């Protein structure tokens, strides 16, 4: 694995120059984009005033590098490789340039499409869609992940994401194929996940819960459903760590011409009860929702849908966190990932079938997105992380 500077074509350089500011070499906000096909993590500096990007370098991580997360102290980037041997890399973030360098590698038990950390910075949470499991790895005091899994839990079908609440006491994971959100309590003494009571909450059948986001005030949990494009809003009981459904709001308008998606069939040797019937694909265009994000002030929430390649905007009511769908925007083709910068002023979107990233300015009163620019990116762009250093 190596860190190299980009050699851009003349046209790409011209586009970058035109769409970005001159680029401040002392920029303190860095954008990281994993490009699964290329096996690279692209690094950009972001202009804090305009949101424009300057591509700095690319780290050769390995084929199928996909989910990433940043350490609590912002010194490390953890990147998961979904090609064999399955592994997670600990990468040092150069505070001056944003460039990455490998510090450690640890084995993973399966192909993991999701990774996150808790506020303590001592645990790495992963979820395996194909392996129907979640796994927890320890993070050393030096921020490195060097040991194997501390805990592995077999789940229902298609574990797709796993996140901690803002306190680190509770952890939630989605099972897309089983239509449930799992609820855990983190034992502070052992660092192990324990099933909460109840251990799960069901969505409506066929919804396919995918990605989870927790509101900044820790009162609400929002789950994007891949197969129907709903955002399910749950109230979080912070005394018990349990969820209760408040509402379910569509992110895909009826006139989009999409039909509900279909969950994959259960594997032959599965560790949980599988439905008897398997729905056949009728060839109609399907909802294929992907990612969800919320601004740091909790006022605006965004989701992506990959079949139509659009970003949806919701306004979030103060206090109770209820959602109002506002509109949607065209974006990069097959937008698997979005990320909002820590200031809440800019949104970055990637498309798995696009060779460009899009940056949007977020109107601070309405949440409306205005394009800032499009920037070259390696093939198979998916996951995005943004780091602002003090």
Model-derived features: where do they sit?
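Blade-loop segments of beta-propeller domains
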Residues: 55-121
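An edge-strand/N-cap motif at the start of beta-rich repeat modules
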Residues: 24-48
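Beta-rich, blade/repeat-based domains predominating
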Residues: 62-73, 108-123, 152-170, 203-220, ...
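Short loop/turn segments immediately following beta-strands, especially the blade-tip
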Residues: 45-51, 91-98, 137-144, 184-193, ...
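Structural signal for beta-propeller blades
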Residues: 40-41, 85-88, 132-134, 179-181, ...
